[in-house]
Regions:
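Extended, charge-rich alpha-helical interface modules
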Residues: 1-80
Length: 80
């Protein structure tokens, strides 16, 4: 996946997350919406992590394509 594709995926997920937050703020969120919000947050963490990995590999002169998606438990516990 190219960085541009990854950034586009992040943009779409952020948009979806904002829509879900709006539903939550209005008291209109269902259980399924809250569950989806959790999934989107986790997936965003993974996407941002992958983008950072790709960037770091490129800077180090390595192949950014060798970066891989890490599990949710790993990326959720990073200090940012």
């Amino acid at each position: 996946m190219e960085d541009q594709d990854l950034r586009e995926r992040i943009r779409k997920l952020v948009h979806e997350e904002h829509e879900l937050f709006q539903q939550e703020a209005q008291g209109a969120a269902t259980y399924a919406m809250r569950e989806r919000m959790r999934e989107v947050e986790e997936y965003l963490d993974q996407c941002w992590d992958l983008l950072r990995q790709r960037r770091a590999k490129r800077i180090a002169g390595l192949d950014p394509e060798s970066a891989s998606v890490r599990d949710v438990e790993t990326v959720e516990h990073y200090d940012q």
